[in-house]
Amino acid sequence: MLQTRAKLQQALNSLLAAKSQKDRAAAGDRLVTIVRAHVASTVTAVEEPFPVERVLRRTLQELGDIEAPVSRLTDDELETFNRLLPWGAMTLDQAGREVGQVWSADKRGVPSGLIDPRQTQFDKVFPLKGRTVMEIGCFEGIHTLGLLLLGAEVTAVDGRVENVMKTMSRLWAYGRACELLLWNVERPAPETLPKAWDVLHHIGVLYHLSNPVEHLNELLPRTGAGLLLDTHVMSDEAETSESYAVGGQTFRTRRKPEVYADSSPFAGMEDHAKYLVLDDLVRLIASHGFGDLRIVSDRDERNGRRVTIWAFR
């Protein structure tokens, strides 16, 4: 098994390093050969194809028959595109070429699909087509692109100008565009922010904030119909280290250092963040009139407990 993994990793590295269509095809064939040989030698079959192949299949399905502008770039032009900005995540074009770059082997180390499964699941229950969506923390535009492919009208914000530029570039690569605003959400909302929207899309940001309660108090009243929130939380009061009061209510929190705030695109904008207790977070959301609140995912990750919450008025 270890030998097979080593062969797979070597073949994957060759695929990721390939510059021409011919080299990519050859590397892909080697991957398929290794996987087939492993399946033939074991009792339990591999249920899914290798991740890169699976992501490419998803990409083709998500884009449909429309050729993305990035697919018309030559290999040299795409290489230049990928070098111009400090990417931390990548997707694939319709030929299986990388758009962007990976951050590291253990973080965003493989290509992402264009529509996040959390978005797909939410869309099945609450269709996004034709709805206005406020996306908090667009990062490099992958979630933004997913929302647009699902038919939403998106306004996306981020506190780092390089993330706004990367989002703009990735959307161009796939023939999409939306309203993009530079806004550090630790600060008051700018006048240019829309006054209202149908859905608040909030994935992977809240647990990076030093003021999560004030932040949600500003955004939830402007949210007319639905919330998709994905964040780390504290399980109970025993895990908290402090509390703070906002608007006459007390919230239990645990202070977390944001040690890479100045160097990592994945960190928050301040030197610390506050993790909320799940019960307090649910109470806060409900206080803004979201009567139908569902915890659709509750899991343990590297940085602790993480939940996906849907809420509807």
Regions found by a protein language model. Name each.
Residues 109-129:
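Conserved alpha-helix/loop element of class I SAM-dependent methyltransferases that forms part
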Residues 1-101, 120, 172, 290-292, ...:
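Non-catalytic N-terminal targeting/anchoring module and adjacent flexible stem/linker
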Residues 140-150:
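Conserved SAM-binding loop of SAM-dependent methyltransferases across substrates and taxa
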Residues 167-168:
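Conserved SAM-binding loop
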Residues 197, 202, 210-312:
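S-adenosyl-L-methionine-dependent methyltransferase catalytic module, highlighting the catalytic core
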Residues 131-139:
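Conserved class I S-adenosyl-L-methionine
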Residues 175-187:
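Conserved SAM-binding strand-loop segment of SAM-dependent methyltransferases
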Residues 153-159:
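Conserved SAM-binding motif I beta-strand of class I
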